[in-house]
Amino acid sequence: MGAAVKLSDILEYQPVRERWPGLFEAVKAIGAPSIQHFSGTIGGNLCQDNRCQFYDQSKFFRAARQTCNKAGGSTCFAWKGGSDKCHSACQSDSAPILIAMDAKVVIKSKDETRTMPLEELYSSVGERPLTLADNEMLTEIVVPVQVPGAGAAFEKLAYRSSIDYAMVSAGAFVQTEGGRTLRARLVIGAVARGPLSIATVEKTLKNRPAGDQQAINEVAIDAMNTAEAFIANNMTQPIEYRTKMVSVIAKRALTRATERAVSQKGFLEAK
């Protein structure tokens, strides 16, 4: 998939809805239709800059206080007590689901072409959130073919689902075999400086009955606890609310991904 492919082209391409419903959901959640049809691309969504309520303001607004890290200063107003690191949030809607699905990206420069896992595109450094060198650009996204018994789902919490940036988002991938979970990934978006992979998800879910709500609840709580260490006051919504909602969004994504994996009819749910 070329990085310059328009979001609307992805939504209108039937195989995406049938084979990668989680990706369809994420792309559908990006911006208003005017953005999807005229200016929005999948590469642009993956490479967008991090956001923060203190940085994304006019020069007049920012002139009223000390310059923050992202603007070239030496403090972060989003972090309680200040910080020498920028704690802006990665707001890409497509990144969590694509990382959960083990997507790779092709990076090109004048002299070199390289392929790497999508998660390696993100530096988790708020001032410079991408690992791209100045002479490099993202040219392709490679999405694996969905294997039998696998399902993926995307969830987003926002005031207005498509128009607003996410308060919290989640991409989940689950592969089942013989009624049990074989593989699983969960990636939380909009809470940290880069997409946040929950390391314990596969260990917790592997070999458990597919759809085991106790196991899914354990992962959801672990996701919330993990996010709590990274989440900052970089949005207008309270940190406490966003932190608690991580578990809710994670549970929804994992539950629907598992249902799709078991039913193999996930494309019917992507509307």
Enumerate the language-model features and the residues they cover.
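C-terminal structural segment of proteins
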Residues: 1-271
